[in-house]
Regions:
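P-loop NTP-binding core
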Residues: 1-50, 54, 60, 64, ...
């Protein structure tokens, strides 16, 4: 339980630390309750009509392939009705794809010669739904059979939390920072972890990622400048995914710019208000100027 008594310290530093500890304790208790009984985030089951729609087939076709034994029965069958887990749908896709005469009919991933798509969601404004848009887009793509990697570039770790991991309370593993730091970076594959969502992997973030901003300001490595570090990290795993989505912090710092240099497309969410539209216009003007500087430094965008 969270202590009901007020903090007794008068020192601002100790007061801030005490409030932080109380909030983290409250979050931890809430997650234990929300993700009971095994403290793991999970995905709901899908009805037979939903499963057919996601696979792009008819209900009659689903009954046919079950009757023929082409795909196995789901574990959850109630009153003659089938309910599928996302993992069962993912496995059904692979089976149907192998049996299909049309390549890509059920697993629509990259075709030979197609480059990895890297989409960065970014904006100056906090609260513009960057993280929310990233996770919903990732879920949609994974449910439709794409191999998706989400990369959390925000030290706040909101996207990481949406994937079922509280970065500052229950997670002490490797993060994006460990793969792009200047001293002894680890392979990017060591950072990536599976999520509760089949087809979706995560490169998580913690507050430590903010160190990249400080390090980039004082380091100059001509062999691997700051704006190429995320691109080079993604190149290590590009054959394992169809699409990469990057969630950016609400600023044009070194992390965001490094993500821009790696991206094939930029997505700029904004809310429909004059202040947000004005801020977005300023953001894009500054982003264009920074991209020009990166291009002049030799990067191909």
């Amino acid at each position: 339980m969270i202590p009901a008594t007020p903090s007794v310290t008068d020192r601002p530093s100790e007061l801030a630390t005490d409030i932080s500890e109380r909030l983290n304790r409250a979050i931890s208790e809430h997650l234990l309750s929300a993700f009971a009984p095994d403290n793991t985030k999970s995905l709901r089951l899908f009805s037979a009509p939903e499963a057919a729609e996601l696979l792009g087939v008819s209900g009659q076709f689903m009954r046919k392939v079950h009757g023929e034994g082409t795909i196995p029965e789901p574990k959850d069958v109630r009153a003659g009705r089938r309910y599928y887990s996302a993992q069962e749908l993912w496995e059904a896709r692979q089976i149907l794809e192998k049996a299909s005469r049309t390549k890509g009919r059920y697993v629509p991933g990259r075709k030979e010669g197609e480059r990895l798509q890297v989409w960065q969601l970014m904006n100056f404004k906090g609260g513009s739904s960057k993280s929310t848009s990233t996770i919903h887009l990732a879920h949609y793509l994974a449910l439709n059979g794409y191999r998706v990697l989400v990369v959390d570039l925000d030290p706040q770790g909101s996207l990481t939390s949406m994937c079922g991991i509280n970065p500052e309370i229950e997670f002490d593993g490797l993060t994006v920072y460990d793969a792009i730091r200047y001293d002894d970076p680890v392979p990017f594959s060591d950072v990536i972890m599976p999520t509760y969502f089949p087809g979706l992997s995560l490169a998580p973030a913690r507050l430590l990622l903010s160190e990249f901003e400080t390090e980039s300001a004082v380091n100059s490595n001509p062999d691997q400048p700051f704006f190429l570090r995320i691109r080079n990290a993604l190149a290590q795993v590009e054959d394992q995914y169809d699409i990469v989505l990057m969630d950016s912090p609400p600023q044009l710092g070194f992390l965001t710019i490094s993500g821009m240099a790696a991206a094939t497309s930029l997505i700029v969410p904004l809310t429909p208000s004059m202040l947000d539209v004005s801020s977005t216009a300023q953001f894009l003007e500054l982003a264009g100027a920074y991209m020009g500087v990166i291009e002049d430094a030799g990067a191909e965008l």
